[in-house]
Amino acid sequence: MASVKKFSNQAVVNQLRHIERTITSPKNTDIIPDREYLNYSLIPSRGISSYEYFKQRKAELYCYNRKDVKVLAGWIVTEPKTLFPHQQEHFFKIVHNFLCERYGTKNCIQSIVHADESGQPHLHFCFIPVAPDLKHGGEKICASEVLTQSELRNFHPALEKYLNENGLNIKILTGTTKAQGGNRTVSEMKLEREQIYSMDLCRERW
């Protein structure tokens, strides 16, 4: 149901543009241009672009001066097939709130629902992975301390509990979800191959 990927600084611009659909010739063949109007953001307008906000927030944090530092992370959460159409907006709003509480509202760079692709609608939630900086004081960018193996292992159970507590009695911990990160169609798995790492792959690399 959900998977995550990390991005280095040089990949941030293209990732944000891809999610905002501002790339002139996108490589993702699953995008249906006539349905782009169905996409929507869950973040109130900040008066600046998401990239400008990213730079502002990043400047407030300690960050190691290395090209391989992962300065952005992105969860993609897919709408369950058992969800009724009238529940969709409520579902994504709850998921957005869950992620903001988990990773910090001011660290959220983008939160956009895509409904213009084949397969199930899904939420892209991009954030700066921020952790306490015990050495320098304040906060630092550190994906390895935020997206730990424990965090990845507990993500789905915590999300299911949060959904249930907020009025959506959705079971997402099926056998497939536990093993592969979600109940996915062929097109959804193709989407994941192009845009995200699976939960198991994340565990192996992190």
Question: Model segments located where?
Answer:
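N-terminal nicking endonuclease/strand-transfer module with a His-rich metal-binding environment
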Residues: 1-206
